[in-house]
């Protein structure tokens, strides 16, 4: 306190300019950190090699057995194509474990239809044994973590993977994953996940922004986290050695069990996480179809759940078990980032308005605009990132998509900030309700078939 008072009087600044300078410093920290994370893959010389998948394990040399858990609830419209895709894996040693709720009749029937089809093919062509194990159980208040842990009870493979209901998974993913385990000696492998639908029409303006969030997360930021030794894992395309997962007690019962598991494995077990990304091996998903519509799938309510999950992990304090002070500070900052970014989004324009309307020193007023330098860097990276995304995935972006990244970014950040505010409020009042993100399979060329429950 004495040092702070000394700086205050040395600068001889009134209270308001001092506060404005503090706000500017905070905004610069948040903006600079975001820019550094998203540019990590470009500015780090060996980043490309670091996140590159190794060559696949040669045929006949596969050693690891994989259990791929697919937790499902109300997913009849998308799961058939997902299971068909998973059954085309080139790795010979894998099993698909589908975890279902007993009252979800339409999804159960859809999965059983695929099982029957697979059994028929086995009889006719004798191409492979049945790959699918179906687990149906009762849950009073079902969560993804509960269904994952129930499926873990029957898993016997060396590695446990998680696949979501609408995922399009590359056929050679597992042979490359085994090669990455072998090359790095990792305990956990996090593969790339990419949202695919850029959005068509004014009502889908937000989708291109969400696509690029994922693009920069998995091409750059995830590698940075792995380097730091602290990785909040993604919800799918994550592979964990079964012994470690069982020692950890399975997935934490959290609304963001993926993040919670990553925190636990990093902080309490010192797990080594390897990450890899390439367009050819990326798991492809869809952006939520709407901003607020809970029935079809909402970006806002999905983000509310994510932010609450990060906030819960931050307050729980398991990240404080990281071994060094630097790692503790970085882990805490990573978990607090959604809240800090939302706060910064509000403070940047507020500080400028106050600085221009209330008498302040000219130098202080000019400094209010400094955070817009990092904002400009982020916008430029968005434009370049969209071009790179389209080049890698064979997509075509319109002028509208590029214009949206420039002119509608504040609106997108307002949506995310609103979700963060709701998340903080819900956490404060002990509201644990959340909304499952719906699927429309907009990332697939053809609409998924619909199944009705058996009579």
Label each residue range with its predicted role.
Residues 87-136, 140:
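Acidic donor-binding segment of Leloir-type glycosyltransferases
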Residues 255-261:
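Acidic donor-binding loop at a coil-to-helix junction in glycosyltransferase catalytic cores
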Residues 253, 265-282:
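Catalytic donor-sugar/metal-binding loop of nucleotide-sugar-dependent glycosyltransferases
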Residues 160:
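Short aromatic/hydrophobic "clamp" motif used to bind/position activated sugar donors
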Residues 7-25, 38-41, 58, 334-429:
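Membrane-embedded multi-pass helical conduit in multi-pass membrane proteins
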Residues 276-298:
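Active-site donor/metal-binding and catalytic loop motifs
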Residues 32-93, 108:
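N-terminal signal-anchor transmembrane helix
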Residues 119-129, 135-136, 141-157, 171-255, ...:
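Long helical/loop segments within the catalytic core of UDP-sugar-dependent glycosyltransferases
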